[in-house]
Amino acid sequence: ADRIFVMGHVNEDYDAIGATIGMAKLGLSLGKETYIVSSEHNAYYKRITEVLDNENIILSANETKYIDIMRSGADALPLVTNKSLLIIVDHHREVLSASKAVLQAAKNRIIIDHHRRAEDIIGDTTLLYLEPSSSSTSELVTELIGYFDDRLDITPAEATALYAGIVLDTKNFNVQTGERTFEAAALLRRCGANPNLIRQLFKDDLSFVQQKAKLIAGAKMPIPGLSIAIMRNADNDTMSSVLAAQTADTLITIESVAVGMAIVEYKDG
């Protein structure tokens, strides 16, 4: 490949970010021109760089800062050639891709994901690595890093980003965990992943907490065991998907609630 592009899903979360950083690390270590294709609204990446910057930790691979190799879909598209490789992480459906244009332009594609296979899976892939039993895509990428090269040095910042992805999707190691999850976490801890920084990453501001409390307070139980919260007019809220996910997680911690749902309403449907 002349260039490597790594792309997560739209509105990337910590798992998508950790996985893109991990795969970009592998590309850079091979001496390849490597780019991360990101969506327009990337609040999680901004958050992780802010937390690391506050500790004077630079998220980089050797002399390359990851923020410097990030490209929007529009900026990345002219760089894609017939020899380029696109690594798709943490999703496998075109509708979820950070850039559909880059996806369609890339002739050589690899998918690495932990979600169950959907009917509308992206086709024409060189390699398809779907592992639904894995806790997260960050776990899968950490395993690949472990197998890749003994000389590959993972920095504490890179390890922290991958660790954050595992923590997010396992809800702090409470769900969807197995032996491989803890082995990956142990590898990242040996590389310097910082749990204290992880806790800072998952802190929410007061406005976010108030929004979540409002949604929970307005939740209804149409039938026993099912609780539904509805978030309306969310078109301009870049954190709406995160808010919905956290609201649903909170609903199922309520006694007598077996299923928690948070529905986000957009004007375009």
Language-model segments: residues:
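Short, hinge-like loop/turn segments at secondary-structure boundaries
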Residues: 51-56, 105, 128-130
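Fold-independent oxyanion-binding glycine-rich loops
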Residues: 8-10, 39-40, 62, 89-92, ...
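Glycine-rich, phosphate-binding/catalytic loops in enzymes
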Residues: 23, 103-106, 127-128, 184
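Hydrophobic/aromatic beta-strand patches that form the interior of the parallel beta-sheet core
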Residues: 35, 85-87, 108-112, 127-130, ...
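Hydrophobic helix-and-loop "lid/oligomerization" segment in the mid-to-C-terminal part
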Residues: 1-12, 16-56, 60-61, 66-69, ...
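Active-site cofactor/cluster-binding pocket
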Residues: 62-124
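A generic local secondary-structure boundary/capping motif
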Residues: 74-77, 98-101, 128-131, 151-152, ...
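Short alpha-helices
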Residues: 114-185
